């Protein structure tokens, strides 16, 4: 297996495609089998995908829009004309396929269709892939995961992120060989010939404050412990959230999301987070994940320092899960929450440096998403917010 990355800050899609494809071709000695593509909304143009396909014939493309920039082992990349980042993978002894499906009104069906098409593209119909990489718009993630698992089962790690934009205005898009897509699920199935490792964590810790969701609907928490959810959350945050009344609370709630225990490792709880986005006039909280009555929610807290260090620690865990030292890594993919990135934007060079320390010399591509998907240690696939999800090869 060979892995290479490239980026471009060019002011036109065709030039960005030329620069990145030329760099990949030079490093890999030809076109990759799998091309992972992330770009800011400014560069989400059909011409970008068309030019990449022309320059790298045969490469199967998967990816989506990334909030404000991308990152590689060369640094954090953003510019006035947007940014493009690519990772190319060559693995003659492995198999890879990408499939896409329109979301429609049934996310589960779209996830099932996309993964079935990906298996056909890989030439591995009806087999269970080693890994799955996914990209979809925000808001449908649990359904997409359920659909993928309805085809391949629940034991295959599903890793990825929900496409993002700059202003939470719906400008997010998905990428596949067909072009720039809107409201689609794009799935890659991976049968790598090398070792692999995956990890899914956050940079937050529980505060000791928790409650039971006693009323909920889809992605709204109406009551916690039979009290208005906003009132409880406002008390937990000591009035920081809710002091201005109803409205958007996304930025102010970033340091204090809600967490649910997804699994335990040697008695240590592993949390998946939900980011409160809106405080309703009736005291309800709207999240970026589904929530159910009976869920126990913990108020979590994270600092800029913990968010900066977490990406490297997740890479460490992914390599350990794969059974090799970070220095022996061939490369990897990193999904880093867009909200966390905005919270520590001035320190993104430090985030990149933490990843470099964890797998020195290895290429990687990172995107900033509005929802993260990953596998907890027992291969329990989950969707969360404010998380870091990583896939490494060694």
Listing of model-derived features with the role each one plays in the protein:
Residues 1-34, 38-55, 59-345, 349-362, ...:
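Small-residue-enriched flexible segments
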């Amino acid at each position: 297996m060979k892995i290479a990355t490239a980026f471009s800050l060019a002011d036109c899609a065709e030039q960005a495609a030329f620069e990145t494809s030329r760099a990949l071709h030079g490093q890999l000695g030809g076109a990759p089998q799998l091309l992972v593509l992330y770009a800011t909304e400014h560069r989400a143009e059909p011409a970008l995908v068309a030019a990449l396909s022309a320059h790298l014939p045969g490469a199967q493309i998967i990816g989506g829009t990334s909030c404000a920039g991308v990152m590689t082992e060369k640094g954090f990349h953003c510019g006035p004309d947007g940014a493009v980042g690519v990772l190319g993978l060559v693995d003659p002894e492995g198999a890879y396929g990408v499939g896409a499906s329109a979301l429609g009104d049934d996310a589960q069906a779209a996830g099932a269709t996309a993964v079935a098409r990906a298996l056909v593209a890989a030439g591995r119909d009806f087999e269970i892939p080693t890994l799955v990489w996914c990209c979809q718009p925000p808001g449908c993630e649990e359904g997409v995961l359920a659909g993928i698992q309805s085809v391949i089962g629940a034991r295959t790690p599903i890793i990825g992120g929900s496409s993002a934009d700059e202003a939470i205005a719906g400008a997010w898009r998905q990428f596949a060989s067909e072009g720039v897509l809107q409201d689609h699920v794009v799935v890659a199935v991976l049968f790598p010939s090398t070792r692999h490792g995956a990890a899914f964590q956050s940079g937050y810790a529980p505060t000791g404050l928790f409650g039971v969701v006693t009323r909920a609907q889809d992605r709204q928490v109406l009551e916690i412990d039979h009290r208005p959810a906003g009132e409880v959350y406002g008390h937990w945050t000591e009035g920081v959230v809710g002091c201005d009344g109803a409205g958007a609370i996304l930025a102010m709630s970033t340091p204090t999301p809600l967490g649910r225990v997804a699994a335990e490792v040697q008695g240590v709880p592993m949390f998946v987070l939900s980011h409160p986005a809106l405080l309703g006039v009736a005291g309800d909280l709207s999240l970026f994940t589904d929530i159910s009555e009976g869920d126990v929610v913990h108020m979590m807290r994270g600092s800029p320092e913990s968010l900066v260090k977490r990406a490297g620690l997740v890479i460490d865990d992914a390599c350990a899960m794969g059974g090799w030292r970070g220095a022996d890594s061939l490369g990897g993919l990193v999904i880093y929450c867009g909200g966390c990135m905005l919270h520590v934007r001035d320190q993104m060079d430090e985030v990149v440096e933490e990843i470099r320390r964890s797998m020195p010399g290895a290429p990687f591509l990172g995107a900033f998403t509005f929802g993260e998907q990953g596998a907890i240690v027992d291969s329990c696939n989950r969707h969360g917010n404010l998380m870091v999800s990583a896939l490494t090869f060694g």
